[in-house]
Every structure is written in structure tokens, then in C-alpha cells.
């Protein structure tokens, strides 16, 4: 299993399970709730006391950081089942609703998701407005968000 060549910064978090126990078939995107660089975002997930991580951080400037190898499960969504099958991406955002992201962050996130899907054989991303369909991967749904599993944005 490979990591994205688009990552221009790597700082591996100790907060993970190695290896993941499920084929990658899902993308989970979450807002970081701070306009951080990828480097700063990865640094946040270093303390073991944090008990959280993600596979990638996308910075406000379009930088991409690798926090947890794709072969490993991040601790991102409060659901081990989801995290074992998903690549989890934290995207720098404003710290209040509507949690806006910069154009550079949005473009980098789209490039990263495209790369992840190509490398992992995900032919199509399917979003549902129905939480049950997202959480249970019904009707082809293979996109989830943190708020599906915890009281988050």
C-alpha cells in the first residue's frame, strides 16, 4: 500500500493501529477548525495524550501532510470500523460555521482525493444525505464525515 506522492510533509503520528484490517474503500473528510499549514496540522496529532490522528492534513496554503500511512488505521472519526476502511483527511478551515476553506486547500483536497481513489481502485465516490446510508455503506455510499460518529462539525 502506498501513500500519496502529493504529500509534501510527513510527520507520522503515534496515534494509530498498524496495520488497518480492511481494504480502503471510503473517504472521510473533516474540517480541522483552524487555518493551519499541513506541518502544523500534523504536529497537533503527535502527543499520545491527544488520542487522535488522520491520514492526511490539507493546509490552508494547499500543503499536504501525511500523518498516518495509508496502510495503517488513523484515529479520526470515533469509529474504528470506519477508520479501518477510510482514508481520513483533515482540511484547514475557519474555526466557526460555516467552516470555510481556502481555494488552495479545496483544490489540494480534490487532487488528494483523486489520487487516493486512483491508487486504491475506488472508481466512483458516492455521497448520501442520509446518515444511515453513509454509516452503513448502503447504496454504494463510500463517503463519510466525522459528525456521523461523534458530535462534531
Where are these regions (language model features)?
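N-terminal catalytic cores of peptidoglycan-degrading enzymes
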Residues: 1-83
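Short C-terminal domain-edge/linker segments immediately following a structured domain
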Residues: 58-63, 86-88, 118-123
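Structural preference for beta-strand elements that scaffold enzyme active sites
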Residues: 26, 86-88, 142-144
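Cell-envelope and extracellular/periplasmic
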Residues: 33, 70, 82-98, 114-118, ...
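Basic/polar, cationic surfaces and motifs that engage anionic cell-wall
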Residues: 1-11, 16-21, 95-153
Amino acid at each position: 500500500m502506498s501513500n500519496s506522492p502529493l504529500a509534501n510533509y510527513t510527520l507520522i503520528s503515534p496515534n494509530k493501529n498498524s496495520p488497518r484490517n480492511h481494504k480502503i474503500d471510503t473517504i472521510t473528510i473533516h474540517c480541522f477548525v483552524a487555518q493551519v499549514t499541513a506541518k502544523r496540522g500534523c504536529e497537533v496529532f503527535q502527543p499520545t495524550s491527544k488520542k487522535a490522528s488522520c491520514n492526511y492534513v490539507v493546509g490552508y496554503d494547499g500543503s499536504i501532510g501525511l500523518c498516518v500511512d495509508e496502510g495503517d488505521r488513523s484515529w479520526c472519526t470515533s469509529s474504528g470500523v470506519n477508520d479501518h476502511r477510510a482514508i481520513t483527511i483533515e482540511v484547514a478551515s475557519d474555526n466557526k460555521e460555516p467552516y470555510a476553506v481556502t481555494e488552495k486547500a479545496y483544490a489540494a483536497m480534490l487532487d488528494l482525493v483523486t489520487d487516493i481513489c486512483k491508487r486504491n481502485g475506488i472508481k466512483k465516490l458516492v455521497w448520501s444525505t442520509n446518515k444511515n446510508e453513509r454509516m452503513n455503506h448502503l447504496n454504494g455510499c463510500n463517503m463519510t464525515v466525522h459528525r456521523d460518529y461523534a458530535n462534531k462539525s
